[in-house]
Amino acid sequence: MIPATYTLSQITARLGGEWRGEDISVTAVRPLADAQAEHISFLANPKYKAEVHDSSAGAVIVSAKAADGFEGRNLIVADDPYLYFAKVARLFSPVVKARGGIHPTAVVEPSATVPASCEIGANAYIGANTVLGEGCRILANAVVQHDCKLGDEVVLHPNAVVYYGCTLGRRVEIHSGAVIGADGFGLAFAGDSWFKIPQTGAVTLGDDVEIGSNTNIDRGAMSDTTVGNGTKIDNQVQIGHNCKIGSHTVIAAKTGISGSVTIGSYCIIGGGVGTVGHIEIADKTTIGGGTSVTHSITESGKHLAGIFPMSTHKEWARNAVYIHRLSEMNKRLKTLEQQLSDAGQDSK
């Protein structure tokens, strides 16, 4: 495929911003350290300004404040250089559209609805009574079981699985190995063994949701597990049954959300976070990587961190200073206690 080429003026005409210097052509986005004359790079953090001076990039995306330090360079000045970089990267890597057609080895049940605009890959399976929207891409070995409903332009990458009865909104993307709608972990103890509770709910994903590789979102026990519009979930995340996750929340890899947790909108949850079940996390909460969330967070906008116990980020950072000194402090405390005890004995 011939690489796309854009001049700086063409980029700003599409995305806004202001170009300065020569109206050069660029063919790709690269990091400052690797960029060459045909590439465009970006400066998101001012502390890396020195890298701009050392870079061979043909052009650099910068903020208006930073631009004054780079006279003579080809620039695009943007309010948010990092977001602008993401949009430029999308220009060079456009969303792949479905090539209509069903591979001869795919299996589509007769009662399924598959528009001609959909692309069904090799060995893929579409179950009975499932309805696909326009322009879906169900790639090799992906499975959509019976009675599902997929919106327009949904993408299932190879070996992704959507269990029966689930609903996916428009432009949902499910990466390889992810499983949507497997049974939740619901068991009742029967005295000498565990009795499995039928999981009769399903999973509902809103528009523009993205689910990473090998992530599992379990179906609800009686009502649906839900994920709101625009939420992005990384690889190897476990979402337990009955969870309700709001819109535009992001969850990083290796996080485990126990059953019946409600998470608000615009939350940021770092990698390796674990939660107990049946709690609520307010809108716009930020949870640092590795945090154990043991109780509800009711105040919106909190920034929490700490392996254990959970606390505000400010409290955790202040207390973390002392962790490596605990042994020394314990020795000093014992010495002081002994001195006080000796002083008490001497006064008798």
Curated annotation (Swiss-Prot):
GO term, biological process aspect, one: lipid A biosynthetic process
Bilayer-crossing regions: none
Keyword Protease: no
Gene Ontology molecular function, alphabetical: N-acyltransferase activity
Protein name: UDP-3-O-acylglucosamine N-acyltransferase
GO cellular component terms, semicolon-separated: membrane
Family statement: Belongs to the transferase hexapeptide repeat family. LpxD subfamily.
Self-association state and partner proteins as the record states: Homotrimer.
Cited InterPro entries: Hexapep, Hexapep_transf_CS, LpxD, Trimer_LpxA-like_sf, UDP_GlcNAc_AcTrfase_non-rep
Stated role: Catalyzes the N-acylation of UDP-3-O-acylglucosamine using 3-hydroxyacyl-ACP as the acyl donor. Is involved in the biosynthesis of lipid A, a phosphorylated glycolipid that anchors the lipopolysaccharide to the outer membrane of the cell.
Pathway: Bacterial outer membrane biogenesis; LPS lipid A biosynthesis
